[in-house]
Amino acid sequence: MSSRILYVDDEDDIREVAAMALELDPDLEVRTCASGAEALAAAAEWQPALILLDVMMPGMDGPTTLGRLRERPETDDIPVVFITARTQAQEVEGFKALGAKGVIAKPFDPMTLAAQVRGYLKP
């Protein structure tokens, strides 16, 4: 059975590279969104096993999107991992305090992204 991954990033190129890299793993099923608002709808409808969420997006940023996901009963328990260039220890701890399961550094290596995601899917 495959694990559903929702990848959210406002940058088309990054979103496409991430989706292609993740789809190389036959155990991952991937959908993408370009905004926090799209992510809220997709998460409620599709119920992914994990959401990979860009921190800095126009409109609704990653932390705001995470907060909205946590407010809704249908999405409040979906794990979220932030994708960000902001990886200093205090920032990472701040993201975890908001409810993120972890952080993947941006830019990421497309060849190791699926392995990182699998690590977050483990119970």
What is each model feature region?
Residues 12-31:
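Two-component/phosphorelay signaling modules centered on CheY-like receiver
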Residues 32-50, 67:
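Acidic, metal-coordinating helix/loop segments flanking the phosphotransfer/catalytic sites
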Residues 57:
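Receiver (REC) domain active-site loop signature in two-component systems and cognate sites
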Residues 101:
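Short, glycine/charged-rich "phosphate-handling" switch motifs in NTP-dependent
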Residues 108-117:
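C-terminal output helix
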